[in-house]
């Protein structure tokens, strides 16, 4: 997620020694994060001692919920990370760190995790955090009466699925004493601690009141002061936070639906950090005063074409490979996103263990693509629909894909829908091709391989290509049980290679996060996981 010369290392930005002129599932609109030193209301500050806004433009709408049990969208997940903690947590660079658990051990058979809890933690209402809160929090999420939005991160726990279905009250969570909890799994799952850093695994009090969503009680570094829906959320720092209180007194998350508005505010100096809209990437990179402010990092995010392998010609791997070969992906990346990413030759981002950075993507070759179609029995080409969301830049990208495919006798009809309708159609198996992106839930190659290509996840689970291969499934399943990191990475590489050879989906590129940062901001780290930035290390100097 150095110095201010971010062209050398665009990952972390420190404050300069002098003042400079004032002047990012979820992708193009704006959630404004405002950092102030007092509990000042939203708006422009005039005194030099006060602070301005910090914008994260990946989110443009209100959080759906501040209750971890119902935090299924990115804005909610980020807000939950401010207010609550899990046993583990993500750093901005996606490393998994101890959270409410200071350490843990795993049994030799990989089934029992013993978590040792911190003794210096209190909820914001003053209640000490204890091991019983782990058991009650997990039981609450899994209780059918809670109607939690996304409980699958807890499914590895023994008895969790039966508990969630209401057929059992037995759950593999045992409190040994106030500071020790043992979690037993159904089967070994080596990356289980990463799942515990997700919002749904956050700790909440034993008793949840009716106003919990509007007045949440957590252990996190921030406390909610005010939530003006569709306008802003105001947070005050938790001075007693066990991990060290934030340096800034107040954090305000303003909702800005229009990226152009966010850009204008940044250039007016009223916000501190801007998530650069995709369609403005080149403008920011090519303008000297703007480019000096840029900070970037590879995100755990893949753009791809889901190819429904159960429909007509798309059942044939030669047709799927022809689609991939008909696309000049480097040119698409350069012209539409100003090179803001890296061409993909698989689904695992290069920064994750298991990625094969030496694998080359299929080269653009329209003649070879037409030959493959002929071999597959389609000498006159094929007709398909390409679905995409109405959110920029997907329509433009879809039009470019349409033009390339036409050169190889792949005739495309573009179907634009709102994101929810498009997603529902794809998961129901109603699409031929669907243009999508995938943003990691947790930083592990498994979170790309399993959701996107495992047969158990077809349809509603997210495998909208309906790809199914027994060898691929076996490799991923074996990786769940493998405790040796090097061997697990090799299983990931083998699965990714097989999925790419079979073109279970057509990977396009891995995306880069790109922010603009005001010169008075210190310690900002570009987050590569959605809930990795909690603003603990950010400081604001004089303008």
Question: Where do the PLM segments sit?
Answer:
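Ligand-site clamp/hinge motif
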Residues: 210, 238-284, 402, 411
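Ligand/substrate-recognition segments at binding pockets and active sites
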Residues: 47, 353, 374-441, 513
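N-terminal lobe/hinge region of extracytoplasmic solute-binding protein
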Residues: 58-108, 139, 215-219
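Surface-exposed, Gly/Pro/Thr- and Asp/Glu-enriched linker/hinge segments
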Residues: 43-54, 97, 123-187, 206-225, ...
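Long beta-strand-rich cores associated with HINT superfamily self-processing modules
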Residues: 515-543
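Extracytoplasmic/peripheral linker and loop segments enriched in polar/acidic and small residues
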Residues: 43, 173, 407, 411-422, ...
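Gly/Pro-rich hinge or "lid" segments in bacterial periplasmic/extracellular proteins
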Residues: 157, 167-174, 185-246, 250, ...
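Append "and occasionally in soluble cytosolic enzymes with long acidic Gly/Pro-rich linkers
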Residues: 237, 315-403, 407, 468, ...
């Amino acid at each position: 997620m150095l110095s201010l010369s971010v062209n050398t290392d665009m990952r972390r930005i420190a404050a300069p020694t002098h003042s400079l002129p004032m002047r990012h599932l979820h992708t193009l609109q704006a959630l404004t994060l405002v950092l102030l030193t007092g509990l000042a209301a939203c708006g422009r500050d005039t005194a030099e001692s006060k602070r301005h806004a910090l914008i994260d433009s990946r989110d443009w709408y209100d959080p759906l919920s501040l209750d971890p049990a119902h935090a299924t969208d990115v804005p909610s997940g980020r807000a939950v990370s401010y207010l609550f903690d899990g046993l583990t947590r993500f750093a901005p660079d996606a490393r998994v760190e101890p959270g409410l658990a200071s350490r843990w051990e795993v049994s030799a058979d990989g089934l029992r995790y013993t978590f040792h809890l911190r003794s210096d933690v209190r909820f914001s209402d003053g209640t000490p955090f204890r091991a019983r809160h782990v058991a009650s929090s997990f039981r609450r999420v899994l209780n059918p009466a809670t109607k939690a939005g996304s409980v699958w991160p807890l499914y590895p726990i023994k008895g969790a699925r039966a508990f969630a279905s209401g057929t059992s009250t037995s759950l593999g969570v045992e409190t040994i004493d106030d500071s020790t909890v043992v979690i037993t799994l159904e089967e070994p799952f080596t990356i289980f601690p990463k799942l515990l850093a997700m919002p749904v695994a956050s700790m909440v009090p034993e008793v949840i009141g009716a106003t919990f969503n509007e007045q949440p009680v957590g252990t996190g570094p921030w406390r909610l002061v005010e939530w003006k829906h569709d306008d802003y959320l105001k947070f005050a720092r938790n001075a007693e936070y066990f991990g060290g209180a934030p340096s800034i007194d107040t954090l305000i998350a303003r909702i800005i639906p229009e990226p152009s508005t966010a850009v204008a505010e940044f250039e007016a100096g009223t916000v501190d950090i801007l998530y650069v809209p995709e369609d403005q990437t080149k403008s920011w990179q090519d303008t000297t005063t703007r480019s000096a402010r840029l900070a970037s990092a590879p995100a755990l995010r893949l753009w791809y074409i889901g190819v429904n392998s159960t429909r007509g010609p798309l059942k044939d791997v030669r047709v799927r490979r022809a689609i991939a070969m008909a696309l000049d992906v480097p040119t698409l990346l350069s012209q539409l996103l100003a090179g803001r990413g890296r061409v993909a030759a698989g689904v695992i981002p290069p920064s994750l263990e298991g990625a094969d950075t030496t694998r080359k993507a299929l080269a653009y070759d329209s003649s070879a693509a037409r030959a493959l179609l002929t071999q597959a029995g389609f000498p006159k080409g094929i007709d398909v629909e390409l679905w995409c969301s109405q959110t920029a830049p997907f329509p433009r990208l879809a039009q470019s894909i349409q033009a390339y495919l036409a050169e190889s006798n792949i005739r495309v009809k573009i179907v634009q829908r709102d994101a929810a309708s498009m997603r529902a159609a794809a998961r129901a198996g109603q699409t031929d091709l669907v243009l999508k992106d995938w943003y990691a839930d947790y930083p592990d190659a498994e979170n790309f391989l399993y959701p996107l290509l495992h047969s158990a996840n077809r349809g509603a689970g997210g495998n909208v290509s309906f790809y199914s291969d027994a060898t691929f499934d076996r490799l991923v399943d074996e990786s769940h049980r493998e405790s040796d990191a090097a061997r697990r990475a090799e299983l990931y590489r083998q699965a990714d290679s097989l999925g790419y050879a079979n073109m279970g989906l057509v990977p396009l590129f891995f995306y880069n996060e790109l922010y603009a940062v005001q010169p008075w901001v210190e310690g900002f780290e570009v987050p590569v996981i959605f809930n990795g930035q909690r603003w603990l290390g950010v400081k604001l100097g004089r303008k």
